[in-house]
């Protein structure tokens, strides 16, 4: 009996333990539970802020900004508010909190959210930042979550880890508490008049701050950054020099003696030698060759030499024309005086009209003029209209501009042109003279003159079947009407 009781009690204890475990598993985890370090070691700051706003602050912090700060090393967090209706911002120190457990991040965020809630709801009645109103909300959240939100953080070791620049005063304040003349900062900024306590220190102590500690290799890193800043520039310059195949500074393009787009380099001080072989130019040098006769746009093949070693690759350049070059090139590039070689001939590079002995009399360089014969009278308007009396065509010496063959032959084409015949005018003249009783033979003469080349239908003559007279085919119908009606007019038709 006793043994059964002992077994029953033991089973009951085991059952109670299991029930307690199940009940504890159903309860939500605390915000600062140790298991969060494994489940979510690096939580999302925005997600935590939204969750805490809905749970502890009734959604009043929707307009508040929260973000990380990478330069803040003296405090874990800060909350700023710009007046009533202004912007509220929460900034957490990334350098300090990344070295602390997740619990410290949650408690610091809730601490700053309490400050933001007091700012937003205009309930900031506390003379100090952590007065009764702040403590009321702090205790409320600590009871709900089991967290340990405090007024001040205890991250002193982390703060000292970042304060690696130390200065100490050599005056009397080095023996006074609590600082003993030390100034520790995370940045390399020596104590100066920009500090709010500088004036009091000068009055009470008057000592000078001397730097006694800094991070290892800090000075070398500064010099290394300066050298590294200069190194890319020299590397770029060396790379450009290697691409150009030279170790000398880049010479700007002078515009002479180079071919744009050519990859090979040609020195500006190289010698330019023409590839044409000149045998004897004594006879040609005596002749007068004008500078306009030289074709400057012709490409001359030259060689580029430097240090006595000529390059095999030729370059196309345009050298400046000189008197010797003109005499040489004129023998290889003969000049054409005019395009119309039938009317003019070439005499020493000047156009001279064919059939004349004295070349200077009719040369174009002397400014002579050539008259164009007038054309025939225009037959269309039945009036004598002559073309311009003369057309002056002047060609400069040594150029290829002259009268073309089309201009010279345009006059013959105009003379051989057939004028258009105004048939209606000619027929009206015949009709009027016939009705007035005039002689058809006399009236036909101006008609024949005005219409020398009419069409076949107008010039064709037919015999009248009534009076057997010869009449124009175009007038046969009217003539037959008069003959058949027995017109009183006794006119007989004449031969046209």
Curated annotation (Swiss-Prot):
* Residues binding Zn(2+) 1, per UniProt: 111, 115, 130
Q: Where is this region: Disordered?
A: 346-459
PTM section of the record: Autocatalytically cleaved in response to double-stranded DNA-binding: autocatalytic cleavage takes place in trans and leads to inactivation.
**In this UniProt entry, which residues are annotated as the site Cleavage?**
227-228
Task: Indicate the residues that form the catalytic site.
Answer: 112
The highest taxon in the source lineage is Eukaryota
Sequence positions that bind Zn(2+) 2: 464, 467, 479, 483
Question: Zinc fingers (UBZ4-type): which spans?
Answer: 461-488
Question: Where in the chain is the Glycyl lysine isopeptide (Lys-Gly) (interchain with G-Cter in SUMO2) cross-link?
Answer: 303, 342, 361, 431
Alphabetically sorted, this entry's keywords are: Acetylation, Autocatalytic cleavage, Chromosome, DNA damage, DNA repair, Hydrolase, Isopeptide bond, Metal-binding, Metalloprotease, Nucleus, Phosphoprotein, Protease, Ubl conjugation, Zinc, Zinc-finger
Instruction: Give its E.C. classification number.
Output: 3.4.24.-
Task: Indicate the segments forming the SprT-like domain, all copies.
Answer: 45-212
Quaternary structure and partners: Homodimer. Interacts (VIA PIP-box) with PCNA (when ubiquitinated). Interacts (via its SHP-box) with VCP/p97. Interacts with RAD18. Interacts with KCTD13 and POLD3.
Name used for this protein in its record: DNA-dependent metalloprotease SPRTN
């Amino acid at each position: 009996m006793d043994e059964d009781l002992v077994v029953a009690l033991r089973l009951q204890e085991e059952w109670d333990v299991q029930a307690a475990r199940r009940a504890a598993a159903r309860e939500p985890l605390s915000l600062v539970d140790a298991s969060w370090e494994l489940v979510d070691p690096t939580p999302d700051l925005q997600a935590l802020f939204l969750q805490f706003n809905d749970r502890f602050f009734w959604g009043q912090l929707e307009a508040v900004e929260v973000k990380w700060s990478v330069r803040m090393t003296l405090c874990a967090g800060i909350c700023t508010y710009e007046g009533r209706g202004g912007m509220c911002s929460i900034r957490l120190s990334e350098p300090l909190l990344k070295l602390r457990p997740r619990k410290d991040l949650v408690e610091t965020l809730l601490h700053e959210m309490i400050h933001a809630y007091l700012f937003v709801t205009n309930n900031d009645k506390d003379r100090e930042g952590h007065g009764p109103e702040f403590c009321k909300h702090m205790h409320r959240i600590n009871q709900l979550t089991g967290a340990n939100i405090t007024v001040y953080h205890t991250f002193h070791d982390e703060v000292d880890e970042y304060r690696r620049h130390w200065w100490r005063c050599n005056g009397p304040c080095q023996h006074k508490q609590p600082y003993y003349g030390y100034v520790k900062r995370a940045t390399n900024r020596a104590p100066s008049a920009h500090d709010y306590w500088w004036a009091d220190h000068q009055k009470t102590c008057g000592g000078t701050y001397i730097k006694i500690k800094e991070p290892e290799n800090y000075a070398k890193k500064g010099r290394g950054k300066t050298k590294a800043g200069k190194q890319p520039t020299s590397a770029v310059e060396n790379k450009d020099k290697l691409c150009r195949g030279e170790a000398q500074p880049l010479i700007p393009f002078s515009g002479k003696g180079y071919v744009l787009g050519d990859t090979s380099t040609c020195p500006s001080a190289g010698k330019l030698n023409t590839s044409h072989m000149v045998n004897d130019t004594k006879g040609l040098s005596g002749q007068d060759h004008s500078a306009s006769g030289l074709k400057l746009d012709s490409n001359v093949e030259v060689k580029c030499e430097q240090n006595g070693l000529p390059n095999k690759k030729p370059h196309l350049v345009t050298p400046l024309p000189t008197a010797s070059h003109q005499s040489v090139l004129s023998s290889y590039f003969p000049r054409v005086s005019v395009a119309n070689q039938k009317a003019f001939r070439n005499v020493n590079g000047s156009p001279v009209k064919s059939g004349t002995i004295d070349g200077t009399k009719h040369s174009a360089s002397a400014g002579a003029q050539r008259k164009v014969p007038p054309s025939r009278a225009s037959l269309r308007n039945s009036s004598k209209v002559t073309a311009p009396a003369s057309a002056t065509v002047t060609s400069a010496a040594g150029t290829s501009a002259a009268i073309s063959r089309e201009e010279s032959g345009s006059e013959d084409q105009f003379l051989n042109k057939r004028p258009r015949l105004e048939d209606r005018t000619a027929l009206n003249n015949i009709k009027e003279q016939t009705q007035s009783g005039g002689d058809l033979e006399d009236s036909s003469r101006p008609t024949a003159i005005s219409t020398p080349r009419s069409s076949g239908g107008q010039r064709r003559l037919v015999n009248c079947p009534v009076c057997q007279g010869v009449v124009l085919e175009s007038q046969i119908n009217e003539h037959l009407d008069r003959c058949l009606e027995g017109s009183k007019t006794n006119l007989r038709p004449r031969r046209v």
